[in-house]
């Protein structure tokens, strides 16, 4: 029976632990509410690509003496779960620090208490550690609220910031457009003394939400809209998850981000490409405060086929019950991929494989799927499972005889050893592996044909049993005792090999065959009147009862295996002592590629 208790060890768990040391062994993580795995040692991407443009820029800055070391950070906002796109940033920032003997901080940009929660703080830390990284320092932007406020007063005193009474809607109207300059706020020319008085009144809670803002005084005619007197502070009488009710004004992201980098002595602030036009503002704040000035470098964010990455859309999927939660195995979240059975090694390898680019592009999800196939092919033990069974009876098998067959655990790894599988006169095979009348190139079992049973014997089909509707319910075969795998003396050659389980000894399990959540490459490119939800794949989950070999009866949560000839599977946390549940990670081959190829013909 399945054991969800991670302190217990099954045969498969023992197998996995013998294959990996503590840093790489990964029992599948819990559903969001159970203990996280132990932090692993600092890890680096599995592949070492040639130097990308960010590495070249860092090398140049170090050579010129602009900086004397590498200090990076991963700065998520704790308002949701991380997804595969964040994994790219994590691998990049932590990987650069590791490769170059530097440091990498984990900093939570917790400047918006309306959307943030400690649940996300905890889950993000778990995800970073699960990927194999450990931060040098853990920080929160809220740790710097006092210093940020002091610097705001400094800019006010210097005449470089002012308190504005415009509403949010009026502020947008005054900002202008990409083709039209903005207009100065009617409050832009207040004296520094008056602005300081108003700012302190804002801090003291004397105004309502949205009544006033603090804005930087830069240039309302700038071609860069981000420099048109950006808001630095807004009023929000909302308790903060760390500071409580101490503050009723909160810094905007652009104001908090660069200054937090500066306080932590970050040297390279690596951001995704959408922040490229924010870089002049990042620089303006550092220069006008006269503080340590990190270099901001942007790279292309990860976009992937058959996937949506928008936090808003992912939230919609959860809220409208299109998925079971943030950790649904069809979601691109790290908690979802983790529950699906993806390994941290495969995700790091994927991030290294796709590289770092300056321009946005879309990566084929096949590359992510292939990364986990490649990793699990080398480490996952093989087991036999029949998902859609039909009975196969060996008519010349001695009655009551059970023979133990020796089966290799992993042909890619000799040290993985072998196991014993019971073989009897009544077996289950896959329904699709038999045809009463088969096409010419059907090399599996057919009436009048022969096939090898993996790790067993060659069998010859001589008849079938049908029900009242004419459906085949049983396949009748004889076996050739001279053809036992590993001891074959018959000299017979057959073209097909199929898997099987002994009917008497098979264990019943639940299998969840997960597939891609969307049926089109780009769900965001919806029709004029439609929505990305119109492209949901109705067949993204199929649940069935399967029959598996006895070795899987003791499978524990997190055990990953290859169901021979079918795909890679992992034991789901929903498993109980009475029911083992296997999630399909990926099939052995890219079935979508075949479907698309047929569609193009």
From Swiss-Prot:
GO terms for molecular function: ATP binding; glutamine-tRNA ligase activity. One of its GO terms (biological process) is glutaminyl-tRNA aminoacylation. This is Glutamine--tRNA ligase. PANTHER family: GLUTAMATE--TRNA LIGASE, GLUTAMINE-TRNA LIGASE. GO terms for cellular component: cytosol. It comes from Rhodopirellula baltica (strain DSM 10527 / NCIMB 13988 / SH1). It is found in: Cytoplasm. InterPro entries: aa-tRNA-synth_I_CS, Gln-tRNA-synth, Gln/Glu-tRNA_Ligase, Gln_tRNA_ligase_bac, Glu/Gln-tRNA-synth, Glu/Gln-tRNA-synth_Ib_cat-dom, Glu/Gln-tRNA-synth_Ib_codon-bd, Rbsml_bL25/Gln-tRNA_synth_N. Belongs to the class-I aminoacyl-tRNA synthetase family. It holds the Pfam family tRNA-synt_1c_C2. Its EC number is 6.1.1.18. ATP binds at residues 77-79, 83-89, 272, 301-302, 309-311. It catalyses: tRNA(Gln) + L-glutamine + ATP = L-glutaminyl-tRNA(Gln) + AMP + diphosphate. The lineage of its organism: Bacteria, Pseudomonadati, Planctomycetota, Planctomycetia, Pirellulales. A motif ('KMSKS' region) lies at residues 308-312. L-glutamine binds at residues 109, 253. It comes from the Bacteria.
